[in-house]
From Swiss-Prot:
One of its GO terms (molecular function) is metal ion binding. The lineage of its organism: Eukaryota, Viridiplantae, Streptophyta, Embryophyta, Tracheophyta. The gene is S-ACP-DES4. Keywords: Chloroplast, Fatty acid biosynthesis, Fatty acid metabolism, Iron, Lipid biosynthesis, Lipid metabolism, Metal-binding, Oxidoreductase, Plastid, Transit peptide. This is Stearoyl-[acyl-carrier-protein] 9-desaturase 4, chloroplastic. Gene3D superfamilies: Ribonucleotide Reductase, subunit A.
Length: 403
């Protein structure tokens, strides 16, 4: 029977994939199986290359730019990483878990009571906050992409999947810690009843399928500079959603966002420590790498966000985050200033080449230039738009939110 079924399925898939899906549902799952209405149409993509490509054009993809000399410098840090990097990880047994913040499922009556309390706390929170919180959660849920991309860094890869190099151990454990963030926010949002879960889930699938344009070039110098910046950005974002949740009266949600922010801060400390060490042993190469990443402009990891409807979903989500003060253009310049101070870029002297000194000069004046550009852009927006534009978000059942 199995052989006959496999043979029949093979022929059917070649002739008509949609028929094969229907045949499998009837034969393998029973004739009484009735999938949800939106799944009754063929689930086989008619044009996979178009369906699963990023919503925005990704160009100028460059790979493996690190020189052998720089690679050897990075590899020389392995003992240092073993002694200094892994200490930023927390033991699993003493780590918080999502269930610590969610309704208890063991007691049915208590569960329903706690869900009602959760819904009562969240029912008056404005839609714009939920748009930003959902966007933050979706960003966290794209964790498979981040681990995949980090595992492309030359000299820092987990070559076997169970490698015991400090870089591999860190990457797996960092991923495990980060995994709790999306899990917790996703469950809380689901229980709140305030969001259209299916459209949120579609966005997550689209985002993971689209990938991420980091411009790392497989270079660990670039990779750890990027993660230093991004962990700082996510720390700021989650800390601000925590403050707003307190303002709106949901102390549990505030604690959730604050706990996630604390994780991001610890991870920021780890990644900035790696780059600090790179500055110590190779200041010229590291300052040039930092300048290169800033010239390419470090972008948020969810830039390719899409829900199947809004081609500019990330920009709209980011605009709402800017308006309510969760993550702003001013924060971008502030993060750069913070990192330049942290790595003492202005104090670099001996050991810099001519190109290194030019990179240093560029970086030290960049925050001020970014702020000036932001001010001009804000002025143009204010002059051009007397009315307040709004956009419909599928995440909140198509309701409109001001940008």
């Amino acid at each position: 029977m199995a052989l006959l079924l496999n043979s029949t399925m093979t022929v059917a898939m070649k002739q008509n994939p949609a028929t094969a899906v229907s045949f499998m549902q009837t034969t393998c799952l029973g004739s009484s199986f009735s999938p949800p209405r939106h799944l009754q149409v063929s689930c086989v993509a008619t044009n996979p290359s178009k369906t699963f490509r990023p919503i925005k054009e990704v160009s100028n993809q460059v790979t493996h730019t690190i020189t052998q000399e720089k690679l050897e410098i990075f590899k020389s840090m392995e003992n240092w990483a073993q002694e200094n990097l892994l200490s930023y990880l927390k033991p699993v047994e003493t780590s918080w878990q999502p269930q610590d913040f969610l309704p208890e499922t063991k007691d049915e009556d208590r569960f329903y009571e706690q869900v009602k309390e959760l819904r009562d706390r969240t029912k008056e929170i404005p839609d714009d906050y939920f748009v930003v919180l959902v966007g933050d959660m979706i960003t966290e849920e794209a964790l498979p992409t981040y681990q995949t991309v980090m595992n492309t860094l030359d000299g820092a890869k987990d070559e076997t999947g169970v490698s015991l190099t400090p870089w591999a151990v860190w990457l797996r454990a960092w991923t495990a810690e980060e995994n709790r963030h999306g899990d917790l926010l996703n469950k809380y949002l689901y229980l709140s009843g305030r969001v259209d879960t299916r459209h949120v889930e579609k966005t997550i699938q689209y985002l993971i399928g689209s990938g991420m344009d980091t411009k790392y070039e497989n270079n660990p110098y670039n990779g750890y500079i990027y993660t230093s910046f991004q962990e700082r950005a996510t720390f700021i974002s989650h800390a601000n959603t925590a403050k707003l949740a307190t303002t709106y009266g949901d102390t549990t949600l505030a604690k959730i966002c604050g706990t996630i922010a604390a994780d991001e801060k610890r991870h920021e400390m780890a990644y900035t420590r790696i780059v600090e060490k790179l500055f110590e042993i190779d200041p010229d190469g590291t300052v040039q790498a930092l300048a290169s990443m800033m010239r390419k402009r470090i972008t948020m990891p969810a830039q390719l966000m899409h829900d199947g409807r809004d081609d500019n979903l990330f920009d709209h989500y980011a605009a709402v985050a800017q308006r309510i003060g969760v993550y702003t253009a001013t924060d971008y310049a502030g993060i750069l200033e913070f990192l330049l101070r942290r790595w003492e870029v202005e104090k670099l002297g001996m050991g810099l080449s001519g190109e290194g000194r030019r990179a240093q000069d560029y970086l030290c004046t960049l925050p001020q230039r970014i702020r000036r550009l932001e001010e001009r852009a804000d002025d143009r927006v204010k002059r051009a738009s007397k009315s307040k534009p709004s956009v419909s978000f599928s995440w909140i059942y198509g309701r409109e939110v001001e940008l």
